[in-house]
A protein has these predicted regions:
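TOPRIM metal-binding catalytic domain and adjacent DNA-binding surface shared by DnaG-type primases
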Residues: 1-37, 71-72, 108, 167-188
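Phosphate-handling DNA/RNA-contact segment within nucleic-acid enzymes
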Residues: 6, 22-113, 127-128
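Short, surface-exposed amphipathic charged segments that create phosphate/polyanion-binding patches used
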Residues: 29, 108-112, 148-162
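Acidic beta-strand-to-loop metal/phosphate-binding motif
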Residues: 79, 112-123, 142
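Generic detector of well-ordered alpha-helical packing
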Residues: 82, 86, 120, 150-153
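Acidic, metal-coordinating catalytic cores used for nucleic-acid/nucleotide bond scission
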Residues: 99-100, 118-128, 145
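A generic structural motif
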Residues: 137-148
């Protein structure tokens, strides 16, 4: 539980499971159930120590994490790469650095303004390309070096500042998104 608290997840601990037997492939991992309409359809298990692989996933293909929690919230839908970001800021996660056509359909079915928040690293650049392909807005928050994603930003700046910085950094113009992507690529 100390790991979850250190990542700013204290208020969300009830959403996680911990492998109490501490052996096998789930040793030293927190387990996050994946649901669709309240039914478990898979899980992701994240290591809490320095070991590879960082994640184990078992879920339906093209799954979009956290849709059950965003259906009745906000007028926008924040799309992240990682589950932790999605939980902390009530968004969804594609759990990779791309968005499949099937995931795009699921995201669009939420009926919200879509804002993609890529990780600030090289793989995040690929997510920007997919956002452009699907006509989504992209957020380019100005966080300090070493702050790779929204979870890192929450730990450094707090939840409110992180959310405001995301919402105040949204670009909808494809030309401006391309320019900001080039600037970002020079810094990652």
């Amino acid at each position: 539980y100390a790991y979850l608290e250190s990542r700013g997840m204290a208020e969300h601990i009830d959403r996680f499971c911990v492998d109490l037997e501490q052996k096998g492939p789930l040793k030293n991992r927190i387990i996050l159930p994946m649901t669709i309409d309240g039914k478990n359809v898979g899980y992701t298990a994240r290591t809490i120590v320095d070991q590879k692989p960082k994640y184990y996933h078992w879920h339906q293909s093209h799954y979009v994490f956290n849709t059950d929690y965003v259906k009745n919230s906000y007028k926008y839908c924040l799309v992240f790469e990682g589950n932790m970001d999605a939980i902390l800021l009530n968004g969804v996660a594609v759990m990779t650095n791309t968005i499949s056509p099937e995931q795009s359909i699921i995201i669009n079915s939420l009926g919200k303004e879509v804002i993609v928040v890529p990780d600030q690293d090289k793989p995040g650049l690929e997510l920007i390309d997919k956002a452009l392909e699907y006509g989504y807005a992209v957020s380019f928050p100005k966080w300090e070096e070493g702050v790779k994603d929204a979870n890192d930003a929450i730990i450094k700046y707090g939840k409110l500042f992180t959310l405001v910085s995301i919402l105040n950094s949204v670009e909808t113009s494809p030309a401006k998104i391309e320019i900001k992507k080039k600037i970002m690529s020079a810094n990652v």
